[in-house]
């Protein structure tokens, strides 16, 4: 049965409140939690209507593992993902770990700072504004090549623990849907565990 996603919020204030809400705080988070959550994400993505559904890569890692993350769950939802999805996962994860918020919230904050520009112009300018705001160095000459401010990277937070303990990333859907499918699935998952 097709279950469409509601639109993701674009308001940084609303997004900040959502990310600090008890509805997305895990009571604990282990490899078993990641496995069960990852399968729930896969099922949710496969339930999307064809207008929203695309092959996607789901990756869940424990935070703070440098230089490489400790990936505790990863899978493609269906045939059709490509190696570039892995790059997007890496960059979205880096954004969440550095700033402690979702990659979608980072994008919306940068866009809010470009308020004087019209919608289409703001979207064109967002990557450059991000690089300038945080004085990011680009190893390949491209804008923000270590980070991605596109929806889909989401922090794992645990009740009673300060900071981010892990990162959930979806890559392959439209960026707002990458974000929204994680938020919706985490809320349902945490609600079932409460």
Task: Give the residues covered by each predicted segment.
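Intrinsically disordered, low-complexity terminal regulatory regions
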Residues: 1-83
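Extended hydrophobic
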Residues: 129-190
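A generic signature of intrinsically disordered, low-complexity regions enriched in glycine/proline
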Residues: 15, 88-89, 182
């Amino acid at each position: 049965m097709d279950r469409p996603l509601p639109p993701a919020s674009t308001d940084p204030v609303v997004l900040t409140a959502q990310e600090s809400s008890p509805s997305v705080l895990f009571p604990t988070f282990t490899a078993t939690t990641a496995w069960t959550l990852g399968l729930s994400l896969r099922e949710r993505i496969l339930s999307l209507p064809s207008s929203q559904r695309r092959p996607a890569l789901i990756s869940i890692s424990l935070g703070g593992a440098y230089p490489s993350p400790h990936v505790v769950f990863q899978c493609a939802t269906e045939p059709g993902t490509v190696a570039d999805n892995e790059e997007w996962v890496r960059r979205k994860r880096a954004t969440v770990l550095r700033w402690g918020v979702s990659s979608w919230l980072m994008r919306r904050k940068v866009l809010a700072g470009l308020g004087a520009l019209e919608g289409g112009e703001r979207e064109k300018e967002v990557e450059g504004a991000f690089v300038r705001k945080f004085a990011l160095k680009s190893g390949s000459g491209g804008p923000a090549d270590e980070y991605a401010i596109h929806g889909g990277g989401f922090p794992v937070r645990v009740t009673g623990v300060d900071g981010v303990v892990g990162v959930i990333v979806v890559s392959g859907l439209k960026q707002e849907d990458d974000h929204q499918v994680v938020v919706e699935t985490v809320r349902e998952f945490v609600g079932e565990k409460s």
